[in-house]
Amino acid sequence: MERAMEQLNRLTRSLRRARTVELPEDNETAVYTLMPMVMADQHRSVLELLSNSKFDVNYAFGRVKRSLLHIAANCGSVECLVLLLKRGADPNYQDISGCTPLHLAARNGQKKCMSKLLEYNADVNICNNEGLTAIHWLAVNGRTELLHDLVQHVTNVDVEDAMGQTALHVACQNGHKTTVLCLLDSGADINRPNVSGATPLYFACSHGQRDTAQILLLRGAKYLPDKNGVTPLDLCVQGGYGETCDILIQHHPRLFQTLIQMTQNEELRENMLRQVLEHLSQQSEVQYLKILTGLAEVATTNGHKLLSISSSYEAQMKSLLRIVRIFCHVFRIGPSSPNNGNDMGYNGNKTPRNQVFKVRNVSDVFRKINIKEMNLPKHTLIYQATSEQDPLELLWHSLDEWLVLIATELTKNKRDSSNIACILLKQSPLDQQDISLAHQSAIGESGNHDHLLASTRAGDLESCSAIGIQEPVADGQDVISMTANRLSAVIQAFYMCCSCQMPQGMTSPRFIEFVCKHDEVLKCFVTRNPKIIFDHFHFLLECPELMSRFMHIIKAQPFKERCEWFYEHLLAGQPDTDMVHRPVNENDILLVHRDSIFRSSCEVVFKSNCEKLKQGIAVRFHGEEGMGQGVVREWFDILSSEMINPDYALFTQSADGTTFQPNSNSSVNPDHLNYFRFAGEILGLALYHRQLVNIYFTRSFYKHILGIPVNYQDVASIDPEYAKNLQWILDNDISDLGLELTFSVETDVFGAMEEVPLKPGGASILVTQENKAEYVQLVTELRMTRAIQPQINGFLQGFHMFIPPSLIQLFDEYELELLLSGMPEIDVNDWMKNTEYTSGYERDDQVIQWFWEVVQELTQEERVLLLQFVTGSSRVPHGGFAYIMGGSGLQNFTIAAVAYTANLLPTSSTCINMLKLPEYPSKEILKDRLLVALHCGSYGYTMA
């Protein structure tokens, strides 16, 4: 009876408290009963359960073998923690990772739990398996208040973890200022290295912690490298930590020159160097000028080394251009606005010759420098004392003299350039002071290149030795071939420096005049080595006057190389340009309707940001799931075909029936000019992303896109008979024919004939033998240009949003057609040569042999359908099938094996240009199924 009453009481208590009222005898079961109560700090319930239980409070459970005391310390359940300690829980018990309850309390900032654990003699010096103590955990998380309490119990504040790192290391790395101060006040070793030799200052700099680095330096921390020689400054530059770098230089001024010299280290990321120098330059104008001077010094040194034939061209060229790029970046973003000089941008007029090599804005900046105040190296004083020019002016002066020298000798003897061999000599590497003295000497004593030549011809090499010349180049060597690349690289550097002083889009008059002055030599360079154009003469793309001087040489270069140059500059600064199907986000997807693709595409493209379209294109057809490269290609293909839809009246078919040009009567469509702009955007966007369009234009329209004047022969595309008549006029004497032609023509405008003058007063000016050529040109311009000028302007407005005029002029009208529309014919042999096989197929398999036999038998139109079925495009890019694009770049046409079942059709994955071809039992079945797929399944996408 008594036992029954006890059970009834337990039942009642359990129901009232909604929990068990006694622990199971099994520790494993009991601990999981207690654990949620401990986590919730339900100490009364825990006490009640433990009171009548034999449960082992030190029982370790779970994967990491922790006790309930660990759980209480980790969760901050201080009441349960005290209860467990009173019942004999071990405060120093370590889990499988070596952590004690004190470690967990410290890591999570449980102050009360820490205090109670210390009261019960928790050992603060115990390390976990990684060597971390409680003090490490407090330092990692910056728990300074708790650290103050704990250090009183610590015998060694510099206890090391497995990597030799102390609490000070990790506090500095994480930027906890008050924690660092507490540790230092408690006697932490400020210069203690870890196992790799890294000090606390090293750790602070590795994560750009300027505040903790400042504290360490103020407390006397030494500037020490690790065992691999990596310094705190190296770490600051590698991470782009400008503020921390500034702190280091304030305490160790000698590091400034080290930083400047680091611009030559090609292993350091250029953008990180820029970031650091940008921050430093914005601190004060003195600092800004000091950085410019330092960079100019290093650039000048590298430039002169590059002009030395004994140096490594590749290494010195890269180093010079890298330094100059950094210099220009710093120049543009300084705290002051040094771009206040008199240098006006090129506006198409020739610059007066008296402005050649006039000291301009960069030099004006250098004149502000007080050398003594800036404490620069001794050789800098030479520049200031002997010349008004900035350091870079010495390099530009040398460049000018070399070019003048070569021009003079080429003029005297164009076949033999050995006379100047003595001037273009191997030089030993010089330091900056040697170069400074040498060029002051060369400028002051020689005066000009004639003096240098005279002394060289006389055998007097004393003046040559003054600038480090050792021995002449071997006779018979082509001096221009040896020096053209080097001088061209310095010219590129000169252009960059001139450009950084100008408003964007304007070319420095000084550089314009420089190129004009050395025109013949530069043309000689590119004639000998055309690759120089693509490597160093990028300025041609930014100045029409200069481009016109070299255009005949540029267009003589291989089409492939010009294409590479075109895309190199077109895509500069655009990341991941091959992934044109990649959307920035869901809102950037172009959602279009297949049944109204032209109008719906026009709406979404006009609403889209131009820069985002350059970064990536994603297209989805309304009601279809598919997305990816194949869908993008199909969109361009169908959309370009819709442009010539007669319903829009935008383009008319030419006489040959295969090409199109703008319709002079397109105004029947009220929105025609906006549509022309849209057409221009689509073609520009397609060219930008290397997508082909399914449309061919007349040669005259390609000329309009390129800015090339049309001629009477272009009239043949729209009116062959009229073109023959114009040809006849030019070929025959019309003096006595009595044609009575005037400089006006009659034109049909919507059924009404109107007389249109070809020039002012043209109706009263007769066409004669003397002016007939002018007449033919004017009437050609009327038919081919004036009649469609608004349409051309609208198209170019859209096209130039993606393709700059300066870049597209690299090509002629035939090449532009190749770029836009690809090859009109499909070469089956090239197709076979550039096809891959997968999923079980090999080139020699019977099914593959049948497939290619069927392709040979297909009509040209069916081959186009097959190409479109697999790749999403009906055109082959320039260069053939080897250049077909896939979802992530070049992707060969691929045929994959699929198990055969009756009536199974071939399928495709257009994003990867893959034809999934069943293993058909006969050639006849293969051909039948393939044609069904081509004629019935070419459009529409679902997810593969």
From Swiss-Prot:
Coiled coil start-end: none
Pathway(s) per entry: Protein modification; protein ubiquitination
PROSITE patterns documented for this protein: ANK_REP_REGION, ANK_REPEAT, HECT
Pfam families: Ank_2 (PF12796), Ank_4 (PF13637), HECT (PF00632)
GO cellular component terms given for this protein: cytoplasm; endoplasmic reticulum; Golgi cisterna membrane; Golgi membrane; nucleus
Start and stop residues of the ANK repeats: 23-55, 64-93, 97-126, 130-159, 163-192, 196-226, 228-253
GO molecular function: small GTPase binding; ubiquitin protein ligase activity; ubiquitin-protein transferase activity
EC numbers, comma separated: 2.3.2.26
Domain HECT: 609-944
Major enzyme class: transferase
Source taxon at top rank: Eukaryota
Job of this protein: E3 ubiquitin-protein ligase involved in Golgi membrane fusion and regulation of small GTPases. Acts as a regulator of Golgi membrane dynamics during the cell cycle: recruited to Golgi membrane by Rab proteins and regulates postmitotic Golgi membrane fusion. Acts by mediating ubiquitination during mitotic Golgi disassembly, ubiquitination serving as a signal for Golgi reassembly later, after cell division.
Matches recorded under PANTHER family: E3 UBIQUITIN-PROTEIN LIGASE HACE1, HECT DOMAIN UBIQUITIN-PROTEIN LIGASE
Protein known as: E3 ubiquitin-protein ligase HACE1
Phylogenetic classification of the source organism: Eukaryota, Metazoa, Chordata, Craniata, Vertebrata
